[in-house]
Amino acid sequence: MTSPEASATPFEPKKILAQLPHMPGVYRYYDTTGAVLYVGKARDLKKRVSSYFTKTQLSPRIAMMVTRIARIETTVTRSEAEALLLENNLIKALAPRYNILFRDDKSYPYLKLTAHRFPRMAYYRGSVDKQNQYFGPFPSAWAVRESIQILQRVFQLRTCEDSVFNNRTRPCLLHQIGRCTAPCVGAISEEDYAVDVSNAARFLLGRQSEVMKELEQKMHAFAAELKFEQAAAVRNQMSSLATVLHQQAIEVGSDSDVDILAVVAQGGRVCVNLAMVRGGRHLGDKAYFPTHVESALTLAEGGLGEEVEPAEAVDATADAPVDTVPDQPAEEAGSARGAAAASVEAEVLDAFIAQHYLGNRVPPVLVVSHAPASRDLLELLSEQAGHKVSLVRQPQGQRRAWLSMAEQNARLALARLLSEQGSQQARTRALADTLSYDSDDLATLRIECFDISHTMGEATQASCVVYHHHKMQSSEYRRYNITGITPGDDYAAMRQVLTRRYEKMVEQAAQAAAVDEAAGIDGESTRQAEASSLLPNIVLIDGGKGQVEIARQVFTELGLDTSMLVGVAKGEGRKVGLETLVFADGRAPLELGKESAALMLVAQIRDEAHRFAITGMRAKRAKARQTSRLEELEGVGAKRRQRLLARFGGLRGVVAASVEELASVEGISHALAEQIYKQLH
């Protein structure tokens, strides 16, 4: 890796370019603040990076980026495939401004069959292991739960936790309604249950005909042995399976595992719709909306995009494969790329495939709406997956229907997003006008809202939610545990949370001002500018005059502008639409009509603050009630406490256990079991 230049040394690209090798690798551009502008890969670092500084006809946006480059770092790799993998990891980690970015959904849901002797069927998110069986990934939690319901109806596998399974003495309701064979009480043998598990696994893998054929043979065998009750049970199972297959006839195809990727660009935004087929069943889809698209695409339009060797789309039913472009030097490739320049959709699809599949499971077939990634990317995906990954560009039959449906869903999702963005921007403008907030760019308007939640003074929590860039910013939400107050004193709770929230910001502004004053700069101007950059423009308080008065006192003590404080007082009967806005700077209360766009935004932010506060309060209260007694036990640490809860299913089960049962738990001796029993009784 090249070492960054010292900050005092002026940026001289010629010296850096002269030192670059003719080798594959990854390059990174930084600005004067150290922020990453762009991450790219190259089969020849010297030629690739030099092209940014030697070409004379750069687009204005590319030229602007080049003028901002203050530092270049490169990393040499052994191959272009390694460079591609490193580039993808760096884009995810650094989020450069000029790269297309997708939200990193690290955890897709799976359907899990555990390694228990009576395997449990469960919804699962997280990293997979080799001990259990995993089916998926699925595009949504709904798709997993629907599959679980189908398997319950047909194969009657258990879904209960192991701690519940180990402690049952009679069948649960699921057994009574025909959704579980009750292995917990020995209603089915381990061998018969294993057969059901095997059939369920084959069903998920798309081998439904095999399952149906074996069930039919089993039914005839029972009938020949005059075991008519068993034959009737198998017949009912076949009937349930046939019903499921009939209901899903439109979805089921000959393909086993296929992903369908459709890209649509409209109104300055792009949507990638990912539909998943697993075991021949269409499981639904999910829409993705990348950011930084415009900035990234200017690089491609200017002939400075990624060095892509288009992949050949292959399929026996495809009309024709996509033409490939042979390897060319960087300076010669520009004209070829200009003649067959990738569309916006193709560039976005390149980024999506790299960021979505590298490091994740890849199906054997990707049906795509545009010729996407380079052959290097496909080879890397195939190597990672352990099987060949094929791209289908012009599908036929069922695959064409799937792609058409994915494209339509992408258009609908994009239209919905654009409509919501327009509506949200209109609400922001309405609120700004109502509060006489003047700004040329309303996207910079930052609103913070506070709410207090507790139950009869127990587990008091305050929440702070943030509205910025015309939407709620959940990553900036914060919860505050309120302590040292009289239980139920909402005023004291509001005083504490506002002080804790803004006192640090005021201190940071004061410290910056002190530094500037020491350097002979106007410290007061610095303090005001620093405070403005840290503080919100509007602070909403969920409450009336009393809460607003407390907020006014806190802001006055901190030297903050009280005009940004707005209370949201509930109307008569606490009905939505009858709220009154209360101000801390002496303005008269303001009542907005039910149809007011400004009130709709205020209610949206206030309701989100309430939801965030109450969920945190409930979790805190539940944790205190369920674990406090176990945490107080002498000789019982976190691991032993976890084993007790897993063995007995909860605090109630631990309390009801005998000394002998407690001693049967790993890590708990008979003497400790007696001690635990005495402390709980």
Swiss-Prot record:
Gene3D superfamilies named among the record's database cross-references: 5' to 3' exonuclease, C-terminal subdomain, GIY-YIG endonuclease, UVR domain, UvrC, RNAse H endonuclease domain
Keywords: Cytoplasm, DNA damage, DNA excision, DNA repair, Excision nuclease, SOS response
Name the UniProt record assigns to this protein: UvrABC system protein C
Function: The UvrABC repair system catalyzes the recognition and processing of DNA lesions. UvrC both incises the 5' and 3' sides of the lesion. The N-terminal half is responsible for the 3' incision and the C-terminal half is responsible for the 5' incision.
HAMAP family in the cross-refs: UvrC (MF_00203)
Subunit and partners: Interacts with UvrB in an incision complex.
Domain UVR as annotated: residue spans: 209-244
Encoding gene, per UniProt annotation: uvrC
SMART domains: GIYc, HhH1
Family note: Belongs to the UvrC family.
Keyword field contains Transit peptide: no
One GO CC term, this protein: excinuclease repair complex
InterPro entries linked to this entry: GIY-YIG_endonuc, GIY-YIG_endonuc_sf, GIY-YIG_UvrC_Cho, Hlx-hairpin-Hlx_DNA-bd_motif, RuvA_2-like, UVR_dom, UVR_dom_sf, UvrABC_protein_C
